[in-house]
């Protein structure tokens, strides 16, 4: 807190109580070399990209091979964001979320991350292979990684009992 708080009573005097939401300053900035730095970028940028793609499909009247649904969650970080029922006929879901970089990982900030497995287990083999094929066919630089300490919304979709193929990119 940006206040002089030492006790529960001090916090309550400011109108703060247990159960209140905590919102962190995202610390957004653009570096001299043009990089965007901020907390929570994965969700914001993923959402913007998906909304931009939806607008492109609509404006250009692009006919897709199958129906595409966008599902945005606000409970991702607590593990049940993707638990909502999926529309009838949906056989595959992709989570667009994590693009981790760091020690022990192959991906860089300039690549699409294809996740083969996370803390919930492996992603659908056919979906992962399709993601790799599509990246290659479209000249998209990518890396395949495993995130043993992370989970995704599409993992929650499976745990909710939805029998679908699933994948994760970031």
Q: Model-flagged regions — what are they?
A:
Residues 1-170:
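N-terminal hydrophobic/helix-forming segments and targeting peptides
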């Amino acid at each position: 807190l940006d206040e002089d708080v030492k006790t529960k009573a001090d916090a309550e005097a400011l109108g703060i109580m247990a159960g209140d939401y905590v919102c962190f300053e995202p610390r957004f900035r653009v570096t001299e070399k043009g990089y965007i730095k901020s907390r929570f970028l994965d969700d914001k940028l993923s959402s913007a990209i998906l909304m931009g793609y939806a607008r492109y499909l609509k404006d250009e009247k692009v006919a897709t091979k199958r129906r595409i649904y966008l599902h945005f969650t606000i409970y991702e970080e607590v593990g049940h964001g993707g638990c909502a029922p999926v529309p009838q006929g949906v056989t595959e879901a992709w989570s667009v979320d994590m693009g981790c970089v760091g020690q022990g990982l192959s991906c860089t900030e300039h690549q699409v991350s294809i996740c083969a497995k996370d803390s919930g287990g492996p992603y659908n083999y056919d979906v992962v292979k399709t993601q790799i094929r599509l990246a290659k066919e479209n000249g998209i630089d990518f890396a395949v990684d495993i995130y043993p300490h992370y989970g995704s919304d599409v993992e929650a979709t499976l745990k909710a009992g939805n029998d679908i193929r699933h994948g994760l990119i970031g």
